[in-house]
Amino acid sequence: MVCLLCGFFSTGISMASSLILLSASDLAGQWTLQQDEAPAICHLELRDSEVAEASGYDLGGDTACLTRWLPSEPRAWRPTPAGIALLERGGLTLMLLGRQGEGDYRVQKGDGGQLVLRRATP
């Protein structure tokens, strides 16, 4: 019984340590967002300059493109332990993309499709 509990706690600790909060400067740069492998791609720039009213960082690029999936155009973004949140002007989260790997963030849509945010390659 004691060994089972030790294994459980050990697993919980390793899972928690995999949630690393990256800084805005780590994530700043050019990114693309697209649904599945569709040809339409939104080109975004995650900037590390703060947007105080949104409690996040400046989001640049073609943010209007995101309104095909979001109820309003995002103004900012913020890193989270689980991934990247896209924010409206007042700071509410419009979308949370979960980290899948280095430079790869995803969210499952209600219709079964998937939105993929990837760091753009130079």
What are these regions (language model features)?
Residues 81-82, 101-102:
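Residue-level signal for tight coil/turn positions that link beta-strands
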Residues 16-30, 69-72:
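N-terminal helix-cap/turn-to-beta initiation motif at the start of protein domains
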Residues 83-90:
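Surface-exposed, flexible coil segments in extracellular/virion-facing regions
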Residues 33-78, 93-96, 104-113:
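N-terminal glycine/threonine-rich, aromatic-flanked beta-hairpin/loop signature
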Residues 1-12:
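Bacterial N-terminal signal peptides
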Residues 112-121:
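Short, low-complexity, Pro/Ser/Thr/Gly-rich segments in the mature regions of secreted, periplasmic
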